[in-house]
Structures are given as C-alpha cells and as structure tokens.
C-alpha cells in the first residue's frame, strides 16, 4: 500500500492525517477529549500515544502536530 492509499484509509478513522516526509501522523480527539495519534513510516505503524487535552480544545490545532513531531524527532522537509 502506498502512502496515498494509507492516508485515504486513515481518513476514514482519524480526524486529521498529515504527511511529513516519510512519516504519516494520524490524529483524532478521543472520547475523553484527549488527542489520540498514530505515526506511520514507509507504510508501517511506528508509534502512537495520547496527548492530554487539559485546555479542553475542541479542535486539533497545528501546535498539536508540532508537539508530536518534537516528541518523535520528526522534522519538516524544506
């Protein structure tokens, strides 16, 4: 499965899916209003986790992606 097919499949489950180089970050707000994410690299699931949402944000902001990228040392390609 190529990255585009994986992204399309993940969009059926997750709220937002973003590709950064070889990585795909899939992110959603779970039933506890926290941010649930999974990271894929080259089509394979690599890691994932939950980021608490103490401010009760109702939408996913770019800062959440930035935090995930920093935690997993993923860098934007220029």
Where are the regions that the model predicts?
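Serine/threonine-rich, low-complexity intrinsically disordered segments
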Residues: 9, 40-41, 76
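Short, intrinsically disordered, mixed-charge
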Residues: 12, 66, 70-74
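Negatively charged, low-complexity tracts enriched in Asp/Glu with abundant Ser/Thr
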Residues: 1-24
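Acidic, low-complexity, intrinsically disordered interaction modules
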Residues: 17-69
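Short acidic DE-rich linear segments
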Residues: 2-4, 73-78
